[in-house]
Curated annotation (Swiss-Prot):
SUPFAM superfamilies: Ankyrin repeat (SSF48403). It catalyses: L-cysteinyl-[protein] + hexadecanoyl-CoA = S-hexadecanoyl-L-cysteinyl-[protein] + CoA. ANK repeats lie at residues 65-96, 101-130, 135-164, 168-198, 206-235, 239-268. PANTHER family: ANK_REP_REGION DOMAIN-CONTAINING PROTEIN-RELATED (PTHR24161), PALMITOYLTRANSFERASE HIP14 (PTHR24161:SF85). The active site is at 489 (s-palmitoyl cysteine intermediate). Coiled coil: none annotated. Residues 18-35 have a biased composition (Polar residues). It is a multi-pass membrane protein. This is Palmitoyltransferase AKR1. Its main location: membrane.
Length: 844
């Protein structure tokens, strides 16, 4: 049995199969849950032992607790700074004291995010890199394992060394990745000692890099961040496994896609000769592997797909997509002109389906990620419709409606304004936030935000790796942060932001006015030129079968024009709503996104707890697998608690707490309990799904998603620091911020020109606590609801046999696990059973 600190064998990584459906259990992670308010999640482990030889102080209300002796270590756990000061000033303790487990007060303060306590201890001479605990780790490593970003910043500013390794070979970067905390990872990667390839790709005792750990955990955001900083996708561990091999072990589609897009070697073989594809077949994650490669246009063997029109965003595909809707709409209108309407309708539906099939299955690649949203398909439909309306006006209405010159002139102006602003809204930049020019500049930004206690998802974008301006949002389709982001509009194939919002509003307004003028001129055209409809005397031979005589007249005289007019009238159903909503929002100095957030989350700036959710990364990680998890439920409960802490609606919707399987179970249970209504419920679900899709297509889903509609009610009473009245708001919109002397692309703080008296300040969610140290959102967390995002297939009890180096599932198959040998290394010499560390305390 290996003693702690002994180099670990790579035999734990030998290939065997594991199901990618059930999330395996990581005993090391579950044992390393956070120490909160001095309460150890492993107080009762091994008959009350905490795994390091003594029981950690607990805050449970037990008889005689008040009589327990106060030590500097228990005070540091609780963040009781006055008690620490009394102990130090009286000489009863020093900042260098170690407890029975060789742990310093700074370790306990760091693991519990007691920032003020950490600062006091360091100011009074505490050793910043003191090593202690069973795993012989530093305070920086304790804080890193729990993702306490502001403790990390304090320790690093006092000279803590991120490259120090514990007895398992983990440095601060590895442990930050283990925490799945995003902002701490961003901060750690800015440290000079980790910025070089040697630091970024440093390995643990088994040769695993931080990228391998992130891939193994299915942590797509951490994988993306590491790749953006230059992590090596070709590096191998002690068993010859690359990061792609470990991503396949987890079966996370997002991680596999990111690594493949970063040119990872898909044909790399580990020591036993298996490629990532071979392992995917063996571990039953081949489905995720295939879909991940298809997302970026690759075949299963890694070859680029050979398509006639190339990728969905290629120039050839975009040109073909622009042509097909125009031609298809012409065929549809011609069908109505050639056949009776009741015969033409099914043919027109078939032609419409054919158009959609050609675009989405022949021209575009349906297997690419977000292929339809990233294409110009809907822009082509709008442009083709405008072209046919203009053709009918030039070809028929302009010359056949004498006496209506003013209406024709007004329509011509509307057509020109609409077409030009559609082109401008689709082609110009929506107002992207600037990217950092260099890694040095990025380091300065991250360090400054961390020092200010503002390094979170609302101020820093981990996708752009740049500062995020106020009122901006990162668009996953445009892959940039858009200043004063309104929404991503499929009809212009572009984001709507400060740079093109004015053109978008002119386009929608001119479209509504132009359609109304076109419909009026169409009615005049039929009134002047079409002979009155004369129905047949014998109704049994009637061919019109329409409710209004005017429609019969129009179909008899010029059905092609009628088809174009009805198609144009159909667009009024959503453009009028959109125009009214946009005009109202402009007068209130709000965007569509802000109105939506106001209804769903209670304030304009974004999601309550957004920075915390972004740091813990539980949404992205579990959506990649689409499976329910106990840790996900625990995290969701904590997020709901944060919502309540901010005074938001207790019934606020959180869409991440129900996995696919769990949702299906709930549906089936409901159907069983109400069998007589099962068909009705099915129809309701189909209607809800289809209506949701239609709303997303026309861009109105932001008003209906969850409780977004309530934003329209709350907006009138919402505190908005940018709202300066109707006239000023309209001038600011038209001048793109110049009227308020603002540059929205670089607006990081409220300027003096914007009155702070209008603003209701929402505090940032940080993992720091006050000098009292009693906890905020951390306080009520029980050990049972441990927020574990790192799991493995190993069982809680190890087989003592030296031959049983790999865990085995119920079917007798061995499992892949990066933790297997680490568990064995945690056994003390001569121990018959492994005493696993059950908190970051033993990660010392």
């Amino acid at each position: 049995m290996a003693a702690p600190g002994t180099p670990l064998s790579s035999s734990a990584t030998q290939a065997i199969s594991v199901s990618t459906v059930d999330a395996p259990s990581d005993p090391l992670l579950s044992s390393q849950s956070a120490q909160l308010d001095g309460h150890s999640s492993w107080d009762t482990h091994m008959g009350g032992s905490n795994g390091i030889g003594s029981r950690a102080p607990s805050r449970a209300n037990t008889p005689g607790q008040d009589q327990m002796p106060l030590t500097i270590h228990s005070a540091a756990q609780r963040g009781d700074l006055p008690a620490i000061m009394r102990l130090v000033d009286s000489g009863r303790a020093t900042v260098h004291d170690r407890d029975d487990d060789n742990i310093t007060p700074l370790h306990w303060a760091a693991i519990n995010a007691q920032l003020a306590t950490c600062r006091y201890l360091l100011d009074h001479g505490a050793q910043v890199d003191a090593l202690g605990g069973d795993l012989i780790a530093s305070p920086l490593q304790w804080a890193a394992r729990n993702g306490h970003v502001y403790v990390l910043e304090l320790l690093c500013s006092r000279g803590a060394d991120p490259t120090i390794t514990d007895s398992q070979g983990f440095n601060a970067l590895h442990l930050t990745v283990h925490s799945s905390a995003v902002m701490p990872l961003v901060f750690m990667l800015q440290q000079p000692s980790l910025d070089s390839p040697e630091g970024l790709d440093s390995t643990d005792s088994q040769g695993h890099t931080a990228l391998m750990w992130a891939a193994y955990q299915g942590d797509a955001i951490s994988v993306d961040i590491l790749l953006k900083h230059g992590a090596d996708v070709h590096k191998r561990d002690g068993a010859g496994l690359t990061a792609m091999h470990w991503a396949v072990v987890k079966g996370n589609r997002l991680c596999i896609r990111l690594l493949a897009d970063a040119k990872a070697d898909l044909l790399a073989k580990e020591d036993s000769g298996k490629t990532p594809r071979d392992m995917a077949i063996e571990l039953k994650s081949i489905g995720a592997y295939r879909k991940a490669l298809a997302d970026i246009g690759l075949e299963e063997d890694g070859r680029r797909k050979q398509r006639t029109f190339g990728a969905s965003t290629d120039r050839t595909a975009r040109l073909a997509t622009m042509v097909v809707p125009f031609v298809a709409l012409g065929f549809i209108f011609a069908t109505f002109a050639a056949l009776p309407w009741y015969t033409a309708a099914p043919f027109a539906a078939a032609e419409l389906f054919g158009m959609h099939h050609i675009v989405t299955r022949v021209i575009l690649d349906p297997h690419e990620h977000d292929f339809l949203q990233r294409s110009n398909y809907f822009l082509a439909i709008v442009a083709g419709s405008i072209a046919w309306v203009g053709w009918e006006w030039v070809h028929k209405l302009a010359s056949a409606t004498p006496g209506y010159a003013s209406n024709n002139l007004f329509f011509a102006l509307s057509l020109i304004v609409c077409s030009w602003n559609l082109f401008r809204a689709a082609s110009i930049s929506p107002g992207y936030a600037p990217l950092v020019p260099s890694a040095l500049h990025r380091r300065e930004i991250v360090t400054q935000l961390a020092q200010q206690g503002r390094l979170n998802g609302q101020t820093y974008c981990v996708s752009c790796m740049a500062r995020k301006p106020m009122r901006s949002k990162h668009c996953k389709l445009c892959k940039r942060c858009v200043a004063r982001h309104d929404h991503h509009c499929p009809w212009v194939a572009n984001c709507i932001g400060v740079g093109n919002h004015r053109q978008f509003l002119l386009f929608v307004g001119a479209l509504v006015v132009g359609v109304l003028q076109f419909l009026y001129l169409t009615v005049v055209y039929y009134s002047i030129n079409a002979p009155p409809y004369d129905p047949l005397p014998d109704s049994s031979y009637e061919t019109c079968h329409l409710p209004f005589a005017f429609l019969c007249t129009a179909t008899t005289f010029d059905a092609f024009l009628l088809g174009v007019a009805l198609w144009a009238a159909l667009q009024l159903t959503w453009t009028v709503i959109l125009l009214v909503a946009q005009a109202w929002q402009i007068t209130r100095q709000m965007t569509t996104l802000e109105v939506s957030n106001l209804g769903r989350f209670g304030f304009m700036g974004g999601k309550g707890g957004q920075s915390y959710a972004g740091q813990t990364n539980f949404i992205a990680q579990h959506s990649g697998r689409g499976q329910p998890s106990g840790s996900l439920s625990a995290a969701t409960d904590r997020l709901q608690g944060i919502h309540k802490q901010f005074g938001e609606n207790e019934n606020a919707e959180i869409d991440v707490n129900l996995g696919a399987d769990e949702s299906a179970d709930a549906t089936s249970t409901h159907a069983h309990a109400h069998g007589s209504h099962s068909k009705l419920n099915l129809l309701r679900r189909v209607f809800a799904s289809s209506s949701s899709w239609l709303l997303s297509i026309v861009g109105l889903d932001l008003y209906t998603r969850g409780k977004a509609g309530e934003g329209l009610k709350r907006a009138s009473a919402a505190a908005n620091p940018f709202d300066h009245g109707l006239l000023s708001n309209c001038k600011d919109f038209w001048s793109r911020g110049e009227d308020l002397n603002l540059d929205y692309t670089t607006l990081y703080d409220l300027p003096a020109e914007v009155s702070p008296g209008h603003c209701q300040v929402v505090p940032f969610l940080v993992d720091t606590v006050t000098a009292g140290g009693r906890g905020g959102a951390w306080r009520n967390r029980s050990p049972a609801s441990g927020y574990s995002l790192l799991r493995s297939g190993a069982d809680d009890d190890d087989d003592d046999s030296d031959n049983a180096t790999m865990p085995v599932d119920a079917a007798g198959r061995r499992k892949w696990s990066m933790w297997s040998n680490l568990k064995k290394s945690a056994k003390p010499p001569g121990s018959a059973t492994a005493i696993l560390p059950t908190s970051n305390a033993t990660h010392a």
